[in-house]
UniProtKB/Swiss-Prot annotation:
This is Leucine--tRNA ligase. Keywords: Aminoacyl-tRNA synthetase, ATP-binding, Cytoplasm, Ligase, Nucleotide-binding, Protein biosynthesis. Its EC number is 6.1.1.4. The gene is leuS. It comes from the Bacteria.
Length: 802
């Protein structure tokens, strides 16, 4: 008889909730374990089967650690600000807050139905004013430290929608919603100076237990480069511009310069003859995103300004072009071009027939660019030097002549932190009529997002908050000075940068987190989530954590000690699950048909946790069949415990049991859940063959399967006669001595060829081995004379006979 998953799951979920079984203990004597999931955005679509994969992994670890005597922090919450709720509100006229609350309730119910051991008393919601009070508080600290500042930044402006769009909301230069044209225009934006932390963000990666591929993604994003800044005067004017180059040794090979179309000098230096062409090009570029502009494969475009720069090292005049592959927001917005020795410059020079000059020997620049090392030529005082020597000598020359200086730069840009949206955290700053600005006082936080019917974009580029006069307009009670609140809101990243800290102390109204509690719980021991957040979310969270470390709020330099990216669950056809393809599997349906334990077991058994694997109904059915086999082995049709279960030991199962405890314990700890489950299947096969089942082994097995299939685990535990939950029962321990093989397989050879294999005691003497071997190959050596018998104890017997 199989078990009734609906009854069992309902029963134990009710028990856990009523008894607050998974409440986090704050006592200090136990070792701690903090298992964190990337909290979900509560979308209208609800949970899909991809979510529970990571959640089940952290849940297995949390449940095992509790049984191993750890105090465990395993929380859940909601990353609930963001664009979809705002779009829904615009489309339906409902409030984004109501929509969000409804979605959170759906998500919470779905997650509870899967039996995860979360401490629901610690639930956080980024849209709760009691939560975002502290998001705003962190902003004030960034502002005080000079890490939050206002700047003019080119943004994606969509005139038809009257709003600024993120890069992700644009497809082929048009808005994703409605297909309206998008242009680049400068706007006043809040920026966070993440670049000030570039070196620390890079260096501290070495101390983390993260996948190397993920660390490399962060290293590349930060993109530290060493080189030099070089100053170029503009011929016939007092103006100059600066370029950064990693190859100052090739300065003698520069044949032209390129400025970003948005560069401040372009309008000033363009000649009358070139004005029309330059303006037309600038207007065309406004329609392109940074991503499109910097694609390596795209055809190079550009226009000559009519102006010339003077090469500081030899006085040569270099034509100044503008081209879209140079970004005003990246580096200095200007580059010196050495087409003989740089891939992009070579392509550009080839398109516009610009001169090339070889300054490093080793290639044939009439055929292709040469980027390797070699002796310098045509370079005056650098001639004959290799790359490293020439770079050092050129930097020395630049600094002595004040024509430049040594410089380290980062690919990392400061973080554009403002959004022209309603549904986000208000930025706690006031702009006064006299041009000054001040932060809202700490005691006035949270600055609550005002409720409004009108969340349509303002049309001016400001957020919809600009429409709410009674909220925006303020008067200083002391001076009578008039001011306007900041109308931009924070990006969705803000609330997710620090949520792992709030779980430690979710109801504290006096501080972001209690210093004693944070000391007790940090760093997070394991953080599991999708690889799509490998760069931005993790980089931003590490940045905020380091700022909080500098001001004494957190005791560790890094937030997440170990990180793991789960793979993706694909549709049965190996394609990504999506509504449009109609291949989305809803976990609610599986819980109803097969049970939560089956879903959990199946997702962990599909393959390695970091692999992307196709969903399979057959695999799901197989997982259910295994749980049914476990149930039938231990429980009779009448619901009583099987009569095979006895207090007496059973020698034949001893080794299999201890092997299973060892493998499951090690595999769970290393996140190899699929192989742990395989081992449990092997044990169940052995147990079916055994005459009797020692109660100790049955209890040990139930404890091992409970983290994967907790409802069945609890039900079997209660059938074994326990009134308490299995949650805090002690984890089984294996005996190393029981794993040692008593018997070994011996190979028997005649004249070096294998003729038989024998099983015998591992302690058999040479004489016993020889005797048993000769008996086994009697027919092979009949009529031959045995010349010699070579015995290797525990392994092999080789008979020489002719």
């Amino acid at each position: 008889m199989s078990f009734n998953h609906q009854d069992i799951e309902k029963k134990w979920q009710g028990y856990w909730e009523e008894n607050k079984t998974f409440r986090t203990p704050d006592e200090t004597e136990k070792p701690k374990f903090y298992a964190l999931d990337m909290f979900p955005y509560p979308s209208g679509a609800g949970l899909h089967v991809g979510h529970p994969e990571g959640y089940t992994a952290t849940d297995i670890l949390s449940r095992m650690k509790r049984m191993q005597g750890y105090k465990v922090l395993h929380p859940m919450g909601w990353d609930a600000f963001g664009l979809p709720a705002e779009q829904y509100a615009l489309d339906t006229g409902n409030s984004p807050a109501e929509f969000t609350e409804h979605n959170i309730n759906t998500f919470r119910n779905q997650i509870k139905s899967l039996g995860f051991s979360y401490d629901w008393d610690r639930e956080v919601n980024t849209t709760d004013p009691n939560y975002y009070k502290w998001t705003q508080w962190i902003f004030l600290k960034l502002f005080e430290k000079g890490l939050a500042y206002v700047d003019e930044v080119p943004v994606n402006w969509c005139p038809a929608l009257g709003t600024v769009l993120a890069n992700e909301e644009i497809i082929d230069g048009k808005s994703e919603r409605g297909g309206h044209p998008v242009e680049r225009r400068p706007m006043r934006q809040w920026m966070l100076k993440i670049t000030a932390y570039g070196d620390r963000l890079l260096e501290d990666l070495d101390e983390l237990d993260w996948p190397e591929s993920l660390k490399d993604m962060q290293r590349n994003w930060i993109g530290r480069s060493e080189g030099a800044e070089v100053h170029f005067n503009i011929d016939g004017t007092d103006e100059k511009f600066t370029v950064f180059t990693t190859r100052p040794d090739t300065l003698f090979g520069a044949t032209y310069c390129v400025l970003a179309p948005e560069h401040a000098l372009v309008a000033e230096i363009t000649t009358a003859e070139q004005k029309e062409a330059v303006e037309a090009y600038i207007n065309a570029v406004k329609m392109k995103s940074d991503l499109e502009r910097t694609e390596l494969a795209k055809e190079k475009t550009g226009v000559f300004t009519g102006a010339y720069a003077v090469n500081p090292v030899n006085g040569e005049k270099l034509p100044i072009w503008i081209a879209d592959y140079v970004l005003a927001t990246y580096g200095t917005g200007a580059v010196m071009a050495v087409p003989a020795h740089d891939e992009r410059d070579y392509e550009f020079a080839s398109v516009f027939n610009l001169p090339m000059k070889e300054v490093v020997k080793g290639g044939d620049i009439t055929k292709e660019v040469y980027t390797g090392d070699g002796a310098h030529v045509n370079s005056a005082f650098l001639d004959g030097l290799n790359k490293e020597e020439a770079i050092a000598k050129m930097i020395e020359w630049l600094e002595v002549t004040s024509a430049g200086n040594q410089k380290v730069t980062y690919r990392l840009r400061d973080w554009l932190f403002s959004r022209q949206r309603y549904w986000g955290e208000p930025i706690p700053v006031i702009h006064w009529e006299d041009g000054t600005m001040t932060a809202v006082k700490e005691e006035e936080l949270p600055l609550v997002l005002p409720k409004t019917e009108n969340i349509r974009p303002s049309g001016t580029g400001e957020s919809p908050l600009a429409n709410i006069d009674e909220w925006v307009n303020v008067v200083d009670p002391e001076t009578g000075k008039k001011g306007r609140r900041e109308t931009n809101t924070m990006p969705q990243w803000a609330g997710s940068c620090w949520y792992y800290l709030r779980y430690i102390d979710p109801n504290n109204s006096e501080a972001l987190v209690d210093p004693e509690k944070v000391k007790q719980w940090l760093p997070v021991d394991i953080y599991i989530g999708g690889a799509e957040h490998a760069v931005l979310h993790l980089l931003y969270a590490r940045f905020w954590h380091k700022v909080l470390y500098d001001i004494g709020v957190v005791p560790t330099k890094e937030p997440f000690q170990q990180l793991f990216n789960q793979g993706m669950i694909l549709g049965e056809n190996n394609e990504k699950m999506s509504k449009s393809k109609g291949n989305v599997v809803n976990p609610d349906d599986i819980v109803a048909s097969h049970g939560a334990d089956t879903l959990r077991l199946y997702e962990m058994f599909m393959g390695p946790l970091d692999a992307s694997i196709a969903w399979s109904e057959n695999g799901l059915d197989g997982a259910r069949r295994f749980l049914d086999r476990v149930w039938r082995l231990f429980v009779q049709d009448n619901g009583e415990l099987s009569e095979k279960i006895t207090d007496a030991p059973n020698k034949e199962l001893e080794k299999a049991y201890h092997q299973t405890v060892k493998k499951v314990t090690e595999d769970y700890a290393e996140l190899r859940f699929n192989t742990a489950i395989s081992q449990m299947m092997v044990f169940i096969n052995d147990a079916y063959k055994a005459e009797t089942l020692p109660k100790e082994y049955v209890e040990g097995f139930v404890k091992m399967i409970a983290p994967v299939a907790p409802h069945i685990g609890e039900e079997l535990w209660s059938k074994l006669g326990y009134n308490e939950t299995i949650t805090y029962a002690s984890w089984p321990i294996f005996d190393e001595s029981k794993l040692v093989e008593d018997e070994v397989e011996i190979v028997v050879q005649v004249m070096g060829k294998v003729r038989a294999k024998l099983t015998m005691s591992k302690d058999a003497s040479k004489e016993e081995m020889e005797q048993l071997a000769l008996e086994a190959i009697q027919d092979q050596i009949e009529g031959k004379t045995v010349r010699k018998v070579i015995v290797v104890p525990g392994k092999l017997v080789n008979v020489v006979a002719n």
